[in-house]
Amino acid sequence: MMTLKEALSLASDDIKKLRDDLTLKIKESKIGAYVEQLTSTDISQSGVGIPIAIKDNINVKNWEITCSSNILKGYISPYNATVIEKLEKAGLSPFGRTNMDEFAMGSSTESSCYGKTLNPIDNEKVPGGSSGGSAAAVAGGIAIAALGTDTGGSIRQPAAYCGCVGMKPTYGRVSRYGITAYSSSLDQCGPITQNVEDAAILYDIISGYDPMDSTSANINYEAVTPKLNSDKKLTIAVIDNFVSQASPAIQKGFQKAVNALEEGGHKIIHKNMLDTQKIVSTYYIVATAEASANLARFDGVRFGNRKGESGLKDMYVQTKSQGFGHEVQKRIMLGSFVLSSGYYDAYYIKAQKVRHLIKDEYSKIFSEADLILSPVAPTTAPKFGSFKTSLEMYLSDIYTISVNLAGLPAISLPVDKDEDGMPIGLQFIANAYEEQTLFDGALSLEKAINYKK
């Protein structure tokens, strides 16, 4: 499959041929339900730029945007998200929609109203979530690259499960304008690509200050791609209590990466973080509280397909009960509970205090280290139906959610395979706004490992 870097050097006739070839691949693909979303888009109207697949919660003008939810089916976006404007300005163009967990709430892309997405490496395994369609599209060879969103690992975990590279920028580095909010203080948009250099290129294209987003960081920005340096020697921290909780396959892949980094001249130091159970509790209190507020607008009046005809209350009840899936309803209820009178101080305020402790923990580590190396998930991609309870699914994010709570940048890349041939992904975490160091370290590990798909 052609890389993004290679595609950027193509002439217009070659780009047209590439788009035709990818369109054919989409129509013939059996990877999963995200194909329905991709082919439902009128690709001929997408322009002539290099094709990039787009997650179904990012607004593209005149395209349907549903967030993979019944409540938004048929809604046509009247405008482009800032990241889409930046893509088009750089000569790239939206190529098609990719499937996702409903409103980005999930870790397996099973909660979509379009049905589940299959992992292209093993169709019995989940592709991860919530950006599972984007990762599957890249891994399956029907997209050069894709955009996803990451609220608690939703770019990095699918990339790890599918053997791709997935990058979450520093909070505020990429505009959220035009991206449907799940948790406003945690959401970030980022690239899913075939390799680290492509991720750096796409990151450079979509990042930068945007006055349309009040959370956008108004600071100087320098492109990372021209300065990529895989030879830079770094101090890399290993979080021992994270690694010890991972499966034997993940631990084996982790040690392989550590050995490669040490052989490359990088210094490895050992650290510990807060208990992962506390991190999970904090994340789901903060995320669901913000989700309950953000999704209140989908009421059948402002947004959402209206249901119920016997009065205002009936309309609200029927619209939301028929429009939202089970997982979304559950998270809205949990968020409403922790924000309610009598529980706000007991849960939400305490969660915000723990969030600051998490930031402090990272700050202490980065006073001694340039990067942190961590697993992305406790296991490789599980089979469909493996998560018997919501808690089991939530715990699959134990290594990624603290990064969002602290607003830090991170990148996932494949380093090995388990005995079933499934990818093992690890993540580098950097201090805020240190994306250059993040990409340098990731490129160094990628070259040292030389992962074969």
Curated annotation (Swiss-Prot):
The active site is at residues 55, 130, 154. InterPro entries: Amidase, Amidase_CS, Amidase_dom, AS_sf, GatA. Its EC number is 6.3.5.7. It holds the Pfam family Amidase. The lineage of its organism: Bacteria, Pseudomonadati, Campylobacterota, Epsilonproteobacteria, Campylobacterales. The keyword Mitochondrion does not apply. GO terms for cellular component: glutamyl-tRNA(Gln) amidotransferase complex. It catalyses: L-glutamyl-tRNA(Gln) + L-glutamine + ATP + H2O = L-glutaminyl-tRNA(Gln) + L-glutamate + ADP + phosphate + H(+). Heterotrimer of A, B and C subunits. Transmembrane segments: none annotated. Belongs to the amidase family. GatA subfamily. GO terms for biological process: translation. Keywords: ATP-binding, Ligase, Nucleotide-binding, Protein biosynthesis. This is Glutamyl-tRNA(Gln) amidotransferase subunit A. One of its GO terms (molecular function) is glutaminyl-tRNA synthase (glutamine-hydrolyzing) activity. The keyword Ligase applies. Allows the formation of correctly charged Gln-tRNA(Gln) through the transamidation of misacylated Glu-tRNA(Gln) in organisms which lack glutaminyl-tRNA synthetase. The reaction takes place in the presence of glutamine and ATP through an activated gamma-phospho-Glu-tRNA(Gln). Gene3D superfamilies: Amidase signature (AS) domain (3.90.1300.10).
